[in-house]
Structure formats: structure tokens, C-alpha cells
Swiss-Prot record:
Binds 1 [4Fe-4S] cluster per subunit. [4Fe-4S] cluster binds at C12, C103, C198. It catalyses: isopentenyl diphosphate + 2 oxidized [2Fe-2S]-[ferredoxin] + H2O = (2E)-4-hydroxy-3-methylbut-2-enyl diphosphate + 2 reduced [2Fe-2S]-[ferredoxin] + 2 H(+); dimethylallyl diphosphate + 2 oxidized [2Fe-2S]-[ferredoxin] + H2O = (2E)-4-hydroxy-3-methylbut-2-enyl diphosphate + 2 reduced [2Fe-2S]-[ferredoxin] + 2 H(+). This is 4-hydroxy-3-methylbut-2-enyl diphosphate reductase. The lineage of its organism: Bacteria, Bacillati, Bacillota, Bacilli, Bacillales. Pathway: Isoprenoid biosynthesis; dimethylallyl diphosphate biosynthesis; dimethylallyl diphosphate from (2E)-4-hydroxy-3-methylbutenyl diphosphate: step 1/1; Isoprenoid biosynthesis; isopentenyl diphosphate biosynthesis via DXP pathway; isopentenyl diphosphate from 1-deoxy-D-xylulose 5-phosphate: step 6/6. It comes from the Bacteria.
Amino acid sequence: MEVIKITPRGYCYGVVDAMVIARNAALDPSLPRPIYILGMIVHNKHVTDAFAEEGIITLDGENRLEILEKIDQGTVIFTAHGVSPEVKKRALEKGLVTIDATCPDVTKTHRLIEQKLADGYDIIYIGKKGHPEPEGAVGINPERIHLVETIDDVERLSIHNERIMVTNQTTMSQWDVADIMAKVKEKYPHVEMHKEICLATQLRQEAVAEQAKEADVTIVVGDPRSNNSNRLAQVSEEIAGTKAYRVADVTEIDINWIKDAKKVAVTAGASTPTPITKEVIDFLEQFDPNDPSTWKRERKVPLQKILPKVKTKKEE
């Protein structure tokens, strides 16, 4: 079996930055304890488990404001997905120390939205309902920011404003965003369009669209809650025309998916730890459909290998 290692794949700079920020917090004795992460720092359970080993508590719930109410003292880290101004204000009121690990691309979209709102615009925001990134963006002004996920959602919009802007969650499928933006333009011809797919997402999607074409099946290594991982599987099927399966790690691979394949493509979401992806690639490279001894799928990556290394200050 040939394994096509799709490039680029895996970690993006926003994810690495967020994890480094959180690791540095864990190593800083001056920060008040406990240290909490408001939601999953990035959407990957291996990462949150690794942070738990370092004494950082991940709290999850329906929305960021609700999670925040569970915290009475200590330090709170905002995740890479960003938070609304209301969450920041409430954390301040509660006297918590806050650390912002928001991805710079998400911050850029927030700034754009704030500027357009100040100029009197209504905002149409294309995003995944229930995902924390749209929650943070829409939370800037829920009255004037309209969340849409599908073309049907656009049909249901009723905005009476000459000033309208459309933008999007940074990890959406660029093809879905283009289709939805076209529908918005059809309904509101005067709309101002700002496509905000981050470059890392765009490059990874384009790599799958092109490189997965030759494969019989694509394996996407990523957490079930990772929107960008799920979109990579979607791109493989809808754009490259190759059946795709998303797995959290090597243990989730079904032999039936790969036993008849001559070529298997592998990619990984932007929040997937590199050692987890390597384990999948190593398994596929040694797999022989005629030799059951090669079928064993076992995760052996230790938690201490999951997080990126950080430089610690040497004592003088």
C-alpha cells in the first residue's frame, strides 16, 4: 500500500501559539491558581488531556459565559477560538487574571466586525452553529450580527440596512463559504464581502483537494469537535472525489476502510498533535491486508510528547 502524506497538514501557528501560551502559564508560579482554560484550548482531546497532566483544568459547557460562572478564583485562559467582549468583561468583574490565547486571524476578524458595526453596518457571519468561534464573533453584537450556516439560513434573513457586510468563521470550507457568499450577494447586491478563511485552513484544504485525488481513501486525523478536521474530510469527498474517514487516532481506523486500497492519503487537522498523525502514518505504512499481525492499532504516544516544547529561563 502506498501512503500519500498530504502536505501541508497538521498544526497551524495559531494552535501552536495558543498551546505555548498555556504551557508558559503552567510554568509561571506567579499566576494565581487554579489555572483554567475556558473551553478546549484547541479542539483536540489529546491536547486537553496533556494539559490536565500539567495541572491546567479544561472547563467545557454550552457557552463561554456559562462556563465562566463556574470559576470564582484563579487564572482563566481564553482559547484560540476567541471570546465575546461580554466574557472578557465578566472575567474582569469576577477579579480573575485572564490570558488571551485567541488566534491572531480570529482577532483580525473581530476587529473588522467592530469597525463595520461602528460604521453602521449589519453583519452576516457564516459559521458553524454551536462552535465557539462564531459564538465569540456574534457575541460582539448579537442584535446586528446574523449567523448563517447554510443557503437556507440566508433565505430566511430579513435585514433592512443599506450597509451590510458578510464575513466568516476562519475554519470553514472555502467552497461552502463561496457558495453562501454568492447567495448573500444575490439577495443583497449591495453587500460588502470579506472572506476570512485563514491561510493555514485554505492551504490545507487545497492540498487535500489536489493530492487526495489519486487516493482510494483519505484518513483525516482530527478530533470529532475540530471543525477544520471535519471540513478536510468534506473537501476530500466533495472536491477530490475520494471517500474520507476522520479518526481521533490510530485506534479508530477500521480495517475494512483500507484492506482493498492501493493508495491511502493522510492529512491532519490544524489542532492534531504531530506524534498522533505520525502513529497513523506508521501503521498504514506497515499494514498488509494479508497479514493480520500488521492489523494491531494501538496508541502509544505518551501525553508528555503531545504538547510543543517551551523554552524555560535558565537560572543565572
